[in-house]
Amino acid sequence: MAVVATHQFAQCITCHVWSPDQTMVAFCPNNNEVHIYKLIQDKWERAHVLQKHDQLISAIDWSSRTNKIVTASHDRNSYVWNQEGAEWLPTLVILRLNRAALCVKWSSAENKFAVGSGAKTVCVCYYEKDNDWWVSKLIRKKHSSSVTSVAWHPDNILLATTSTDGKCRIFSTFIKGVDTRDSGTSIPDSKFGEQIVQLDLSSTWAFGVKWSPSGNTLAYTGQSSMVYFVDDIGPSPVAQSVAFRDLPLRDVLFISERMVVAVGYDCNPMVFTADERGIWSFVRFLDERKLAPSGSKYGSQFTEAFGKFYGQSKQMGSDTVDPTRARGGAHENCITCILPLRSEGVTVVKRFSTSGLDGRIVVWELDSD
């Protein structure tokens, strides 16, 4: 059974992210601002509004170690926000883009971040202490269309990208003076911007790339209602394509090495798992309106703490797909973002959040059995 709780923060949410202690959530309400809400006595109250961009903010990320927020916008700019006292102060990042910035992610070590753009370019940004500013090195002439998503490998060197040219690519982002060769990367002698592999699995736009916790598996989605899983990244990767008959997906999240939750235009998170042979398949929707068969392994429930400040609406679950079922439930419009909510010292994701074009943020918790 799936129990879902939601909060209506805005009419539409472009993207969202959590503070390191998960007591604050930042999101873009489909404009040029970032709204930060803080949990105070079981109620969400708006604490800050970040105003610096001139156009729509397309992506945001909040570093867990350094407590810095990075934003990317259609105005072709990116800012790093530092909290000083009660204020968040922006620092402009020199991106050198002539098209919109579409996605942004901090690296695993949080000493770099990557910005994908409509200029067919990826900007890998790092801080120059001597000059007290953020600069970028550009990966050019590799993508033939807009870069829709970026994902950092746990080694802090490899970067995966997806593009509207239908391809997923993996690059080295080694920067001398910022990275070290003993980072544990499987490509120890790679240079900045070197393309490690290009995956041509999708014939349509590609979105939502993510690495598994170990970095051994990569997953991304295609506009043709397909999910792609890739193992053994290198000259001879092992790839699988999983087709489904529902609407396309926009983002994916590894719950564990063998479980993925994906979200998109169907307004309902979808669970994919791998069997003992490593074969991936669709399992179920998380927010179904039908009773799940007895013995269903995966379910969803909302924690009591979050339930106090989110309005709860219970929905039933099912492991079978009914083409006549009502779509949605917790979400009523496209889900564009899914993020993990990790507990300290726990590698397997038990809780995660989703946000969408309906202006809602939903927090889910998977059953432990």
How should each PLM-predicted stretch be described?
Residues 1-20, 24-28:
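N-terminal alpha-helical scaffolding segments that mark the starts
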Residues 1-4, 31-48, 77-101, 109-112, ...:
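Per-blade loop-tip surfaces of WD-repeat and WD-like beta-propellers in eukaryotic adaptors/scaffolds
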Residues 10-18, 55-62, 98-106, 144-152, ...:
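Canonical WD40 repeat/beta-propeller blade segments in eukaryotic WD-repeat proteins
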Residues 22-26, 66-70, 79-80, 90, ...:
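Structural hallmark of WD40 beta-propellers
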Residues 51-54, 132-157, 201-252, 361-365:
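Internal alpha-helical scaffold/solenoid segments in large eukaryotic proteins
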Residues 28-31, 72-75, 115-119, 162-165, ...:
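Conserved strand-to-loop turn within each blade of WD40 beta-propeller repeats
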Residues 45-62, 66:
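Blade-loop segments of beta-propeller domains
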Residues 176-200, 204, 240-241, 245-369:
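Terminal intrinsically disordered, low-complexity extensions flanking WD-repeat/beta-propeller proteins
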